[in-house]
Amino acid sequence: MAILVRPRLLAALAPTFLGCLLLQVIAGAGIPEKAFNLTWISTDFKTILEWQPKPTNYTYTVQISDRSRNWKNKCFSTTDTECDLTDEIVKDVTWAYEAKVLSVPRRNSVHGDGDQLVIHGEEPPFTNAPKFLPYRDTNLGQPVIQQFEQDGRKLNVVVKDSLTLVRKNGTFLTLRQVFGKDLGYIITYRKGSSTGKKTNITNTNEFSIDVEEGVSYCFFVQAMIFSRKTNQNSPGSSTVCTEQWKSFLGETLIIVGAVVLLATIFIILLSISLCKRRKNRAGQKGKNTPSRLA
């Protein structure tokens, strides 16, 4: 039995059908699609540019501009949807970098036998990334508490100065060396038995906080950049408590003491065993040596 289709329905479905058909033809012909959703992912200056979609019948090449506004090719003819640009942006973290992702026809495509950055005298389709200023835009990594001590009415905390991928004279610089006094730390602390929190800010890597004597405190720290209006703070460090630290130190000292004691006993027993062997050998040699006649 034949199914009747209304002319109006056919007219409505025609554009959709033709659009799908056109997309299939384009994909089959290897005509590249422009990248979209270009996003900078950066922490402590480790910087990757990500985008979509996954390519079919074409590749991507990333270009980034330097201070001379020259375009440099990176991740040439890649099928990945990300490109590590760390080695370029750490050259000057105060420069606003421009980047773009080019969609380049693959080999044996309709445009020729090889991946080309120029097609019929024109640049292939590309998408510009947002400008990226590393000093302002890189995220701060999670800080690490290097050491702390509760001494009477003072809680002293030292934050580890993290290394970055920024180099000077072949040496990696710390966050402090990059940001100077613009880098600060926030400590959030509370009594171990309380939920009420207090904060303190320093532009160094050390805190000295007034606390109650004999009371346990829990705290965590965050890095911050004073000059930033957005993206100012890092994630918080792991939370630690002074009583936990004392317990940890006690357990550590017990373990270390036990290891030292066992090592000492082993050395003593080994020494006794070696001495006995030497005496036995000396006695054996004495028996085997013939007596001289007077």
Curated annotation (Swiss-Prot):
One of its GO terms (biological process) is blood coagulation. The keyword Nucleotide-binding does not apply. Glycans are attached at residues 37, 57, 169, 200. Disulfide bonds join 75-83, 218-241. It is found in: Membrane. The chain crosses the membrane at residues 252-274. Residues 29-251 are extracellular. InterPro entries: FN3_dom (IPR003961), FN3_sf (IPR036116), Ig-like_fold (IPR013783), Interferon/interleukin_rcp_dom (IPR015373), Tissue_factor (IPR001187), Tissue_Factor_CS (IPR030472), Type-II_Cytokine-TF_Rcpt (IPR050650). Induction: Expression in the liver oscillates in a circadian manner. A lipid is attached at residue 275 (S-palmitoyl cysteine). Pfam families: Interfer-bind, Tissue_fac. Residues 275-294 are cytoplasmic. It comes from the Eukaryota. The keyword Acetylation does not apply. Initiates blood coagulation by forming a complex with circulating factor VII or VIIa. The [TF:VIIa] complex activates factors IX or X by specific limited proteolysis. TF plays a role in normal hemostasis by initiating the cell-surface assembly and propagation of the coagulation protease cascade. Interacts with HSPE; the interaction, inhibited by heparin, promotes the generation of activated factor X and activates coagulation in the presence of activated factor VII. This is Tissue factor. It comes from Mus musculus. The gene is F3.
